[in-house]
A protein has these predicted regions:
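The feature encodes the CheY-like receiver
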Residues: 19, 61, 70, 79, ...
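Active-site beta3 strand of CheY-like receiver
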Residues: 49-55, 60
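Conserved acidic carboxylate
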Residues: 13
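The short loop immediately C-terminal to the conserved phospho-acceptor aspartate in CheY-like receiver
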Residues: 32, 58-59, 73, 84-85
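Two-component/phosphorelay signaling modules centered on CheY-like receiver
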Residues: 16-34
């Protein structure tokens, strides 16, 4: 796996403030980052630019995170991109659904600091 500076992280998050916090934290760690503020933009960005990993909110405008994840996992060019769901939905049904559709992890925003999210990404990409 490449070093941090060659790793491209796509953050799909409609909360602009929160997206900026994650973006700055990843950039401080040397990652290349882009942000999409709705599900349709996130899917389009993933299909065009093939990020190394995607952080995906579930409650998104235009297309929810579950629908984005399903489309990513059914696409020939995107099915192998690891996706971490990063959301406020903490019900067991939501966690189970996200993992069943193909997410590699499911993080509840309130339970993880941005630095811990970066650590999770590093672990998934074998950079830790």
């Amino acid at each position: 796996m490449p070093t941090n500076e060659k790793v491209y992280v796509l953050i799909v998050e409609d909360d602009v403030f929160l997206a900026q916090i994650y973006q700055k934290k990843f950039e401080m760690e040397g990652f290349k980052v882009s942000v999409a503020d709705n599900g349709e933009k996130g899917l389009s960005e993933a299909q065009k630019k093939k990020p190394n990993i995607i952080l995906l909110d579930i409650l998104l405008p235009k297309m929810d995170g579950f629908a984005v994840l399903e489309k990513l996992k059914s696409g020939a060019d995107t099915k192998d991109i690891p996706v971490i769901l990063l959301t406020n939905l903490g019900q067991k049904e939501d966690v189970d659904k996200g993992l069943a559709v193909g997410a590699v992890d499911y993080l509840i925003k309130a339970h993880f600091k941005p630095s811990e999210v970066v650590d999770k990404v590093k672990k998934v990409l074998n950079l830790a």
